[in-house]
């Protein structure tokens, strides 16, 4: 057995012992009690050129989400619904083990889970976002940047996405002669439910 592998095993055993001791003493690794929540801080409107945005700090995890609304073609099989696309990026400064480059499998999974949570909650009435059914729909992009990773990444990212969407100002597009025209008018996402 190599010395690096032996060191890893020793560290894993020490960590297990530390966790056992913390459980017995009624504490978590970060010093919180078992029923104590991580502190939550939020700020909305942090990206001025986005249709909506939010910054969330949950414990030591920080996430920024920005919303951009455009028009585009509907997804196949969903011709009469608007499109939602959630993407995520973990900045290399978020944790010591993060490498620069394209998103890894875990980051892609994070974006998919958050995307699915928004869709299946039906917080967005995607069926009301078809401008020309089968041809042109609202396309809502939500880009998430993970600034710091300190646990509970799925919750922090979900909070940021929901806040960014809930506070978005959506452009109003008009249909003239089977074409979409940007009217430059904005309304808040609350109006989408009316």
Question: Which residues are covered by each model-predicted region?
Answer:
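Glycine-rich, flexible beta-strand/loop modules in the N-terminal catalytic cores of phosphate-handling
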Residues: 44-133
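Conserved bacterial/organellar gene-expression machines centered on ribosome-associated P-loop NTPases
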Residues: 1-18, 71, 85, 89, ...
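A generic structural motif
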Residues: 92-98, 145-152
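Short, conserved phosphate-binding/catalytic loop or strand-edge motifs used
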Residues: 133-141
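Conserved small/polar residues in nucleotide/adenosyl-binding loops
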Residues: 187-192
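Conserved mixed alpha/beta catalytic, RNA-binding, or beta-rich assembly cores of soluble enzyme
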Residues: 148, 153-171
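Short, Gly/Pro- and small/polar-rich lid/capping loops
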Residues: 3-48
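Conserved interaction-surface patches within small, structured recognition/assembly domains
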Residues: 124-130, 142-149
């Amino acid at each position: 057995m190599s010395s690096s592998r032996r060191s890893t095993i020793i560290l894993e055993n020490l960590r297990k012992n530390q966790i056992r001791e913390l459980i017995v003493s009624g504490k978590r690794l970060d010093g919180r009690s078992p029923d104590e929540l991580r502190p939550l801080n939020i700020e909305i409107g942090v990206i001025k050129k986005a249709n909506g945005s939010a910054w969330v700090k949950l414990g030591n995890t920080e996430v920024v989400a920005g919303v951009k609304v455009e028009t585009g073609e509907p997804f196949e099989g969903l011709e009469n619904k608007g499109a939602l696309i959630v993407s995520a990026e973990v900045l290399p400064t978020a944790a010591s083990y993060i490498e620069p480059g394209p998103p890894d499998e875990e980051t892609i999974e994070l974006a998919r889970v958050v995307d699915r949570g928004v869709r299946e909650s039906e917080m967005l009435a995607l069926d009301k976002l078809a401008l020309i059914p089968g041809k042109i729909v609202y396309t809502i992009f939500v880009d998430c940047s993970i600034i710091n990773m300190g646990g509970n990444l799925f919750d922090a990212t979900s909070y940021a996405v929901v806040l960014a969407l809930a506070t978005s100002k959506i452009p109003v597009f008009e249909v003239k002669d089977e074409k979409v025209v940007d009217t430059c008018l904005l309304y808040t996402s609350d109006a989408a439910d009316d």
